[in-house]
């Protein structure tokens, strides 16, 4: 499939066996939306359908795409469907079903008071134990680093919130596939796809772009176990410096990822420089592409709109209608 060209789209919903994770029954849908982002439960769906069972079920939403004799069958979302809302029109009963992501069971259970993730243990072991409460398959790269410091659960921490704290500590990411597989991987700066007006034009002309340098730091404190360092920008040549802005704007890092032979002071200076750039946020609609999820990096080459470089996807909304139109928010790397 050439996703930058037009295709016809149809959709259906499968009931999923929570044990085998395979499709069983099938239900027709008439529309809806799928929401994706980087935080919380990360995914949700609102599905319009007819005669949906009045019970909690695992479901999977599929896109059937056809283009000039080619066809593709793409799972868009797998999650837990709640009890449907009913809309009666004479003898016809239509439903709107709200669906949670496969992470919901891990968000519903509080950790015991006093629970902690111990330092020195491989992060993948703890993450897998915390996610075992879900029915979804879990895929974690074997090279997950160990925790440098213990992470003690707060009184309102759930299995999921602790997983997210561990993910932040090791600077990795969670990526939920359309099949509902929970993936835990290192963050990557490599783009999964490139968009430009000539060779791969998927983005609609209306693009909203905002720029913000207000929160750029000019003082950076790095804390790594018993080491610490502070880097400052007091240069008269720098637009972000304490001199030119007339005040200090601090940023602190407690999860330092030092390069080989890099001192904590060198790390603080490097990170200060990396953080001193204007934040660019862009919002647009585009044609559907199956390989892009929140947290992924894409390359945009739209210089007229001021978008030329690497951007990380923050959120998506997929409309289950013509062409699976995708609304997307991105920020510059």
Predicted features by range, described:
Residues 1-28:
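Polar/acidic, low-complexity leader/linker segments enriched in S/T/G and N/D
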Residues 1-10, 164, 168, 178, ...:
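Acidic, small/polar-enriched beta strand-loop surface segments
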Residues 2, 76, 89-106, 142-216:
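Short beta-strand-centered interaction patches in the first periplasmic/extracellular domains
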Residues 22-59, 105-106, 110, 117-121, ...:
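Extracellular/virion structural assembly segments
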Residues 33-52, 92-105, 222, 254, ...:
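Oligomerization/assembly interface segments of phage tail-like spikes and tubes
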Residues 38, 47, 99, 112-139, ...:
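Amphipathic, non-transmembrane alpha-helical segments in extracytoplasmic/periplasmic proteins
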Residues 51-137:
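Surface-exposed cap/loop segments at beta↔alpha junctions
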Residues 67-99, 175-176, 298-329:
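Short beta-strand and beta-hairpin "edge-sheet" elements
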């Amino acid at each position: 499939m050439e996703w930058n060209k037009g295709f016809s789209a149809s959709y259906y919903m499968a009931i999923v066996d929570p044990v085998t994770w395979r499709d069983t029954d099938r239900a027709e849908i008439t529309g809806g939306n799928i929401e994706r982002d980087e935080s919380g439960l990360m995914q949700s769906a609102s599905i319009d359908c007819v005669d949906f069972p009045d019970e909690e079920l695992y479901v999977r939403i599929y896109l059937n795409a056809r283009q000039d004799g080619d066809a593709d069958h793409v799972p868009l979302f797998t999650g837990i469907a709640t009890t449907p809302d009913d809309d009666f029109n004479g003898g016809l009963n239509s439903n709107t079903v709200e669906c949670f992501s496969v992470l919901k069971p891990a968000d519903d259970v509080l950790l015991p008071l006093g629970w902690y993730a111990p330092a020195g243990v491989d992060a993948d072991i703890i993450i897998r134990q915390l996610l075992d409460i879900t029915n979804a398959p879990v895929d974690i790269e074997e090279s997950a680093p160990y925790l440098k410091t213990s992470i003690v659960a707060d009184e309102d921490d759930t299995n999921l919130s602790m997983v997210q704290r561990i993910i932040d500590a090791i600077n990795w990411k969670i990526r939920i596939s359309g099949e509902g597989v929970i993936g835990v991987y290192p963050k990557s700066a490599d783009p999964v796809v490139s968009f430009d007006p000539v060779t791969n034009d998927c983005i609609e002309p209306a693009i909203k772009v905002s720029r913000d340098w207000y929160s750029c730091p000019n003082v950076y404190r790095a804390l790594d176990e018993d080491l610490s360092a502070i880097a400052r920008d007091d240069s008269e040549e720098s637009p972000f410096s304490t001199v030119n802005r007339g005040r200090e704007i601090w940023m602190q890092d407690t999860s330092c990822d030092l390069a080989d032979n890099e001192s904590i002071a060198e790390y603080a200076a490097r990170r200060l420089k990396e953080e001193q750039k204007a934040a660019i946020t862009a919002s647009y609609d585009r044609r559907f592409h199956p390989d892009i999820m929140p947290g992924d990096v894409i390359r945009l080459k739209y210089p007229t709109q001021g978008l030329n470089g690497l951007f990380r996807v923050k959120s998506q909304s997929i409309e289950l209608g013509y062409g699976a139109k995708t609304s997307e928010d991105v920020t510059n790397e």
